[in-house]
């Protein structure tokens, strides 16, 4: 959790094996209630007597499992209740004479069986777990008498007379008198009980507050004979009395219903009447009333509605429930399923639908009867005759109109073309006068009033027909007259042959149209805006007139046209074009007004205009993307294309085998769903930090993580390493004071380096976020694992999060699905999180090529010695600044020589690799690099050869791990046997390879372990097992494992990506923690509250607020990330049934049988900045892969315990919600004000015991009172007393006004200018 040296020891007393906080006796021994924190990570909270455990207590181990029991002088009295942190299963271990006798397992606990927990202790009671076979039966009359006796005994202040008359069944008057008297008795008893409760709770709260600073006198009364305090016994009695009084009230109320048997139907008091009497009355009403006018059903009363239901042959219960709820004919129209099932009592879903169907039939019959009464058949026949005559007249007019000649149509077209061209020229002249672009006028609706432009599309279509008469003939009538197409008339449906030909020709010439449109686009992009628009119009008209197009119906405007990429042709001057094209036909392709402005097909009017820079950027980015993403990127750049997806019946298959219809494909292209092929993973975002406990580090110190984790582990090699005093290779020796003394030494002192690295060794923060790129932008990619349960719910949740827009929120750019993974793409923020900014030493991460580092390590000594031989002896006395320059120049020389060295080595490695092909067929890419040529002219010394040989052998062994190209993605692998160092013996015979072979002894041990696991699985299903082990507390882990369900390890999944061979060096920037000013703190707090209040209004259930999710940019603007992750994970099934190996292009899924036959074991090895996957095959070979480890959250809500988690979650009572976010907000406020980590314990079990059960509070020193009150209200242990984020925002605005009055704000704004 925190630092080793940062345990809060102010209120704790240190003993030999633990720290203690609580009550003490005279001898300073634990006496009373207190908390023990053991050095091994365990903790205990309970009662003590003279330093021994005596009473109830909770023991919590490292794994956060709770052991609840009663103690007698450091010995367990009867049983131990064991409960894991992430599960609801409870185990009871029973002890007899110091031995574990048997165990009971309870798989489920209902909330009804749980008793109220004590308010003075956070300890769970034994009565939570009850056996289902036990049933308690009690008499109500005996409870009332016992309750009266217990409540009145030993009361001196008040005396109440209790009647001793028993209940007589014959006397009704005595019943009423007794009932009225007992009500008065209950009221007086309740008042007295409330008064007693207040006293007891005040006394117990005083005890609760005295855990960390109290004396033995305050808890002397809390220890009794049966280990329960005196106040707890009284509280139990009070709770019993309340339950008994409630039962007595119910009995008397039930009796009063039978005594007052008078039924008044006129006053509609049906609830006090029995159902039998109502049924008799309904039957009489139904038999007497026979007239029901269906057309006037809205005027029915409730009795007529019941009569109608009886005629429909439905159960009488339906009629009775309708009669009870006063449902008349007017209310029938407003009934729904919820009201029918919950109010009327018709619970079954099918019967409720049947009831609604009856109401619908009633409406239809009522409408038909009304219509039949008002309809006159003679008038209707006359209406039909007139309608038939109108149809015949229309058909005759259409035949006459189609008989016009083609010459008349051409003349009409030419006249319209001249009028349109004159209007366009006048508009262009107006553009030059006003200095406005032609495109702005179109976007502002300039053409909306011009009716002639509506016919532009028809003119272009007719011109295309005239140009392409040879290729395609216009359909003609019997009189050899061409049909007019100007108004978009449909062809004769009887001619099926012509229709088929037309469809074929349409499909044939669509590609030709696309090419011309894309060519026109690129011509317009290359043209200058300064040229007149007349020239651009003539250019496009010339290209459109020469090209031969097919006839396109106006209905094709709704379909999509994908544009092919063509190289733009150079634009010719106007004179050359007029010579080449003397006859220009002014034809312009256009559409309706809506299609001119909002259409996916780029019209030629739009092509004439200069494009905006955003559209040009989108085209350039689409060209660089892959072929699959080229189409989608062009559509995503234009937002006016939403009217193009009309075909909802098509099915599209994507590369990840997801079949979706075109409506979902619309969201796939335009919305937040991104194809996984367009994502590129660069590296995993891992924050390396060093806690600034000891400020002994210099700011210029450099840490080489690759060296510290990999290359300095072999002590023999490093001890023999020579460091030149003139040019140092080790970064540790350059700056630190201890290494300044070792300037003239020839050999490197490994012990000093090791001690320094222990102090400055960085810690790695776990994350499952990668840095990547999408559409040329840097993004942050979060990896979630699991199969999608319900895609519709998943789609709604993601769309809800995708819509959210706020300046203080990390925006979600999209989501990508690749089973079994879900990738959420956020915007990338470069700076660190709030936690690392406040509490961690900063490092700059510099990414360097892996091969460069390899050759630097391998040949650094050779190059340095060559230079040193040529240098003069005066070189030794050069200053440190000159040494750094020389070191930098030498590295540049190495980089230039790397290619030459690499070419020489490849020629020699080919010969050696051919001999090892038989043994290396499984994975050829993991073959080790042979030692390079060390027999150069300058390396004649044998000692230097031996040193380089040993060093190269070690470097080759490590570097072969990272050289492997078979990067895999593994899912849900589990260990088939436990790892023990003593049992596994690995032979390192293959020095230059990554394989090791097991011995025969280790194989036999593995088989025995597998057989033992099978036996343990059978024992899990038994409810009682006799163990007969000696006394142990807590129970031995082996005994506890008998009863645990043997599940596969599904919390860890290995994710790998195409790795660019790189590692990073980290250079420390600051040696001290960052301290924020008051204005910066208020700015960060305002940003957080604004974001949280916005998310609260958007009804996000859980924000997951914590310091690591608050990101800061360069100007310290706070942004919240990871909100809504809980809702997404609820839609995922993390328990995946299969294991996956995902290669770059395909996915292999195999089951457990395949796993056992081919692979024995898979193990993760953490080596600094790299995670290695070791795969043990059936042939006892080890394959090593370069991977990344991701911590997948479990299905339970208690997956993490940190200092910002609320106490109700620490106890495991409730799931996280906005109340827990308010608690975390208060912790963050305290963290900002004090610049320290709250509850900074070493183990999570210590935090759970102290904060969850011992109720430890935070110190509020040097915090202003107005912020102190806000923090206390947010950290309140009662979650319902915590404020909302809207209320917090109001309070913070008031605080800001107090800190910065109006005069100061005015002065600051004046100084800023």
Swiss-Prot record:
Residues 962-1294 form the Protein kinase domain. It is found in: Parasitophorous vacuole; Host cell membrane; Host cytoplasm, Host cytoskeleton; Host cytoplasm. A motif (RVxF motif) lies at residues 1052-1055. It is a peripheral membrane protein. Keywords: ATP-binding, Glycoprotein, Host cell membrane, Host cytoplasm, Host cytoskeleton, Host membrane, Membrane, Nucleotide-binding, Repeat. The keyword ATP-binding applies. Disulfide bonds: none annotated. The keyword Ribosomal protein does not apply. InterPro entries: Kinase-like_dom_sf, MORN, Prot_kinase_dom, SAM, SAM/pointed_sf, Ser-Thr/Tyr_kinase_cat_dom, Ser/Thr_Kinases-Pseudokinases. Its main location: other. The protein kinase domain is predicted to be catalytically inactive. This is Inactive protein tyrosine kinase pTKL. It comes from Plasmodium berghei (strain Anka). The lineage of its organism: Eukaryota, Sar, Alveolata, Apicomplexa, Aconoidasida. The gene is pTKL.
